[in-house]
Each structure stands twice: as C-alpha cells, then as structure tokens.
Amino acid sequence: FGFMAPPTSEVASNHPDWLTQKQDGSQTSIGAGGEVVWLNPFHPEVQQFITELVLEITTQYNADGIQFDDHMSLPSEFGYDEYTVALYTKETKKAPPKDFQNPAWVQWRANKITAFMSQLNQSVKAVKPHAIFSISPNYYEFAYKHHLQDWLTWVRLDSADELIVQVYRSNLESFVDKLNRPEMQEAQQKIPTGVGIMTGLRNNPVPIQQIKSQVQAVQEYGLGVAFFYYESLWEYAPEPLAHRLSQFS
C-alpha cells in the first residue's frame, strides 16, 4: 500500500509514532479501501522500513522490477504530526501553515517525498541495476496537489524507469483530456509511458466497448496500456467472457 496501511495492521499497532496526522489530530482517512492510516513519509524509520521491504523483494525474489502506485504518497491534509511539524519548523523557522494546500507547504512535503523516491531508486539500482522501477500515480495535477506526488520531477531526476498514469474515467472526453497534457508528452519522450484503464470493480462492471474506446484513444497518443484489474477484465463483466475475449483478437 505504499505509505497507506490498515489501522489494525501490525505496523500501525507496533509503531504508532510512525503515523502522521491531520491538523485536528485525527490519523485516518476514508478511501475506496475503507478507513486507513498513513505512515509518515518524512520519518527516517519509516523510510528505512520501506527501503528494507523493497530491497527484500529485489534481492530475495526473481522480480523483474517493482511498481509503486498512487499510495506512495500522502494526502495533503496530513503532515501535522509532532515529528514533521518540528522538522518543518527547524528548516523554515516557522510553523506549518493551517492551510494544508498552501503552495510552499505542499512543495516542501512533495520535495521530501521526491528525495526519498530518488534515494529508494538508487538503493534498488545498487543491488539490481536492471530492475525496473515503475510508478503508477494519478494524473499530475491531482497527484501533486492532493497527494504530494511530484512525479514529473521524479521522471526528470531519472528516479523512474516506467510511468503508468491511472486515468480511471468513464467519460471519454474527460479520459482523453488527461492524456493530452504537457507532462505526459514530456515523460513519453524520456521513459516508457502508459495509461492505467479501469476495467471494472465488483460492484461497478465496465462495458467492453468503453474499454475498447479508451484503448484506441491511448494508442492514438502513442502510449502504452495497463488494465486495472485482471479479475474485473474477465470475471466481473456485463458481457459473456467469450465476447470480451473476442474483442482482443
């Protein structure tokens, strides 16, 4: 889950000091996966924990690479825990702004995550130089403003080998709008760049025609495609399996 974890998880229970919080002291947010807590990406012990997990996968298993999704981030409401407040105050000589979307406050936190991702990439390459370091964030404006993920800078700093941008939209015009962005074109010139297409959820199946239309749009922009996710592509579908399979032949 990146920095996101279930509140009852072992890591959250054993290391309450690793959790960050909102201004009101609350430590949870509600998302598609229910209620979650967030590990503090600015805390050195959290960074070490994540790094060790990633290096274990890289060295102990025959993995071609590793991918970090939109949860390798932090919702911008968070960062008001004691450790982060002290760090920000030490570096800037002032307390964090009450406005969690204050541009300087957003940039400071985003820069810290960027620095960690650069360090993590270097750690992976040190033990497995040809491992693919893949990232799968949301489209840039949302990722940066709401999740402190400055993934365009990650690409510019050579901290990513592959980019798969999640564009989970049912409206084709809105979907295409996210493809036709300068940051997508810039990334595409530097590393393999693709688009994540939503193929459905258990309670929200997606018609194959919508998937086909989006794939065609992506191909027109010369981008790659990844589907989220395997089971919904074939099993939780409004059409018979044979029909969906036939659309890929």
Where are these regions (language model features)?
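Active-site neighborhood of glycoside hydrolase catalytic domains
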Residues: 45, 49-195, 220-222
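Conserved beta-strand edge residues that scaffold enzyme active sites
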Residues: 3-6, 72, 140, 169, ...
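Active-site-adjacent "subsite" loops/lids of carbohydrate-active enzymes
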Residues: 2-60
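Extracytoplasmic/secreted cell-surface and envelope-processing proteins
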Residues: 6-12, 75-78, 143-145, 172-176, ...
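Substrate-binding cleft of secreted/luminal carbohydrate-active enzymes
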Residues: 159-175, 182-249
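Generic hydrophobic, helix-prone segments enriched in Leu/Val/Ile
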Residues: 11-12, 84-91, 241-248
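Intrinsic disorder/low-complexity segments enriched in polar/charged and small flexible residues
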Residues: 20, 40, 107-110, 156, ...
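Amphipathic, alpha-helical segments enriched in basic
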Residues: 25, 29-32, 38, 95, ...
